Amino acid sequence: VPGVTVGHEMVGVVEAVGADVKTVKPGDRVTVNVETFCGECFFCKKGFVNNCTDPHGGWALGCRIDGGQAEYVRVPYADQGLNKIPDSVTDEQALFVGDILATGFWATRISEITEEDTVLIIGAGPTGICTLLCVMLKQPKRIIICEKDAVRAEFVSKHYPDVLLCEPEECEAFVKEHSDHGGADVVLEVAGGRDTFQLAWKCARPNAIVT
């Protein structure tokens, strides 16, 4: 919407609450969910809050109402969209919870990863690293990351030495060489590039899960 201040990844301090808000109070440090949602419609109850049918639901912050780059933000359905930050967690540590880490968590959850799987993650940017952290919780047999940026690849190599690395040009052959069934059992495409979606399918084994 023209004139709306953008921004949807944020943490903040509650300044005031509406009469129906029960879970947070002024002074609380909170994370802010990337999407607003009612929690009561068909899609919310199924966990697909991005498809909330409420007029105030969906992509509101930074799209229809002022977002995180504004000094003050109004968050509809604050009981669903705000989460208190523990005193032991800094604002910087909590920042990714509302969107990027949640993206990796949800992608991992719906990918049905098992301990026997070879998992390919395409992209090692912030979303890719958050996805990696969530995938590691599933303890798959093998994790491969495809990343063309040398700095990002070096970061992965330094901090996650057990993760295999390859570049896009060699990715298909590398994955097939390092998998047990002709390709990755699970592919998570988090790069969003022009060719990465097609690459994901090329690297997946028959009947694989591509997210």
Describe each region flagged by the PLM.
Residues 23, 128, 196-197:
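Short, well-ordered alpha-helical microsegments
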Residues 40-122:
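NAD(P)H dinucleotide-binding glycine-rich loop of Rossmann-like/cofactor-binding domains
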Residues 12-14, 27, 41, 73, ...:
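Buried hydrophobic positions in well-ordered alpha/beta secondary-structure cores of metabolic enzymes
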Residues 1-45, 86-89:
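Glycine-rich beta-strand-centered segment in the early N-terminal region that forms part
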